[in-house]
């Protein structure tokens, strides 16, 4: 269900900082029409820490309604309070989500045993499939391969989004877990190495911009056509890289605004990219013919975006 390319959906906001439901619906429809494999609302790229609880549920509800069973929905439900994560997971199940992506507890930095008990408690409380989400660079805690192996024995913990950037660790996880346990890259740029080791795809940022192309990349790789997949990777690698020139999702939303897909609005503490980075983003988009080339200076207007508080 959660293999291939899953888009970590951005959350669009209006000029007043409110949830832009019209644009959200348009973005979801664009993803479906492009042939995306699954959608991931309310993750890191969706600015989930800045969403209210009501908004979080609303984004997932809209995603579920629009996909209407055509594309699986893996909704974000993670945090440092196990009881609250369970409550949110139950609400997402009631909304019709097909699974949950659950980031490791952050800030309080649990031990490996604490991580195991945290995820076991969630799995026992809901029947939905659970994808673990390990991203030490953001949370300060890593799910070690031995802990992933233990968690993989729990029936409805079916996979992990591994965003450590450590290919050796991903290989160790793949060697430790059952063959049907799904290991997904959390980094667009190393999707091909992960698939070559036995991974099953990627939860992608760049597919917000190029859903059809990223979906094709993983389909080719999963069917053994690494030559074709490499060609796509090489073409779009500059876009994958520029998406992280500042903290995600600042650059990807700036790029999407340049492409006319949404308003360039972030919620504090996220702010628009620096002018020089905005120019770099624009240059990459132009080089890939994702936007028209325009006279210097005019494309940087979106750098002065309103910031929603």
What name fits each language-model region?
Residues 60-68, 90-93, 123-124, 152, ...:
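Surface-exposed amphipathic alpha-helices with a cationic face
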Residues 167-205:
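Anionic-ligand binding region
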Residues 77-78, 104, 108, 133-140, ...:
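Glycine- and other small-residue-rich loops at beta-strand/loop junctions that grip anionic moieties
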Residues 1-7, 11-140, 148:
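Active-site beta->alpha loop and helix N-cap motifs at the rims of alpha/beta catalytic domains
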Residues 100, 155-165, 181-184:
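Catalytic beta/alpha-barrel core
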Residues 81-92, 146, 173, 189-197:
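Catalytic cores of alpha/beta
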Residues 142-159:
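Catalytic pocket-lining loop regions of alpha/beta-barrel enzymes
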Residues 189-309:
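Structured C-terminal cap/extension of enzyme domains
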């Amino acid at each position: 269900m959660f293999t291939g390319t899953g888009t970590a959906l951005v959350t669009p906001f209006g000029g007043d900082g409110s949830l832009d439901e019209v644009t959200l619906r348009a973005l979801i429809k664009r993803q479906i029409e492009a042939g995306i494999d699954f959608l991931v609302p309310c993750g890191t790229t969706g600015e989930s820490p800045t969403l209210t609880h009501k908004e979080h549920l609303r984004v997932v509800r809209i995603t579920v309604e629009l996909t209407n069973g055509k594309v699986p929905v893996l909704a974000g439900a993670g945090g440092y309070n196990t009881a609250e994560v369970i409550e949110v997971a139950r609400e997402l199940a009631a909304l019709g989500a097909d699974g949950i992506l659950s980031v490791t507890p952050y800030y309080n930095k649990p031990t490996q045993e604490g991580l195991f008990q945290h995820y076991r408690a969630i799995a026992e409380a809901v029947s939905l499939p659970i994808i673990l989400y390990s991203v030490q660079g953001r949370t300060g805690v890593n799910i070690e391969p031995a802990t992933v192996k233990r968690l993989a024995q729990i029936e409805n913990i079916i996979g992990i989004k591994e965003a450590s950037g450590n290919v050796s660790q991903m290989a160790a996880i793949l060697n430790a877990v059952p063959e049907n346990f799904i290991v997904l890259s959390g980094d667009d740029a190393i999707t091909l190495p992960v698939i070559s080791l036995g991974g099953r795809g990627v939860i992608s940022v760049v597919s917000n911009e190029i859903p059809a192309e990223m979906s094709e990349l993983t389909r080719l790789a999963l069917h053994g056509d690494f030559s074709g997949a490499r060609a796509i990777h090489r073409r779009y690698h500059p876009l994958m890289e520029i998406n992280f020139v500042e903290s995600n999702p600042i650059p990807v939303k700036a790029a999407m605004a340049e492409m006319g897909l949404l308003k360039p609005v972030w919620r504090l503490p996220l702010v628009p990219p620096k002018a020089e980075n905005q120019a770099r983003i624009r240059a990459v988009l132009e080089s890939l013919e994702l936007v028209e080339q325009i006279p210097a200076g005019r494309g940087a207007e979106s750098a002065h975006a309103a910031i929603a508080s």
